[in-house]
Amino acid sequence: MSSIGTGYDLSASTFSPDGRVFQVEYAMKAVENSSTAIGIRCKDGVVFGVEKLVLSKLYEEGSNKRLFNVDRHVGMAVAGLLADARSLADIAREEASNFRSNFGYNIPLKHLADRVAMYVHAYTLYSAVRPFGCSFMLGSYSVNDGAQLYMIDPSGVSYGYWGCAIGKARQAAKTEIEKLQMKEMTCRDIVKEVAKIIYIVHDEVKDKAFELELSWVGELTNGRHEIVPKDIREEAEKYAKESLKEEDESDDDNM
């Protein structure tokens, strides 16, 4: 009975006999059904890429963004329920703002990730609330700390990464990320690879239309989190499409 959650999935404050919290697992399932987001840390910064599915032709281009500015030096990429993610982005902004007001300098990313993770975890403890149905990545760059990348999931656990993927195609994306020599690459190199990975893992059968969102923070941007300029994004998309075409042609030749 406990393996299917009967009776034990009505509250986030209830454990099943085998030690599972089903409400948190359901929140993670919401993330797994979402479009893919990836973050890669390199020697001079962090690059985010998001596969933003276009569910209607009537949507205005650029709406419902999944990349957020948390602070001048911190960016955020999300997968899962967008409304939940926006709420957590506001919490992260408030934490960053309060830290600067109190101490007079930018909040360290590890501290910010821990603070927001504690907030997310608090929503897994009480029957009166539900867990957040989103996972998100935080990335920053500073001269002292270098590039940093953290991921926080609906259970409230925070992990540090060199490369991370969340969303429906996370396994395929992680496989592609593992092939990269991230520690030797720059943001300029990584942004092309991020675009390529998003195009590789995109499911054209189920999800035909999507927009590629790219942002970065690093030495190139003087430590500020910014959307990747249009010309560089288009160049990265061109590289991704050409790489896919070459791979398809090589597969045909092998057959």
UniProtKB/Swiss-Prot annotation:
Keywords (A to Z) from UniProt: Acetylation, Cytoplasm, Host-virus interaction, Nucleus, Phosphoprotein, Proteasome
GO cellular component, one term: cytosol
N-acetylserine, modified sites: 2
Disulfide pattern: none
Pfam families: Proteasome (PF00227), Proteasome_A_N (PF10584)
Protein's job: Component of the 20S core proteasome complex involved in the proteolytic degradation of most intracellular proteins. This complex plays numerous essential roles within the cell by associating with different regulatory particles. Associated with two 19S regulatory particles, forms the 26S proteasome and thus participates in the ATP-dependent degradation of ubiquitinated proteins.
Protein name (database record): Proteasome subunit alpha type-3
Organism from which the protein derives: Homo sapiens
Gene that specifies this protein: PSMA3
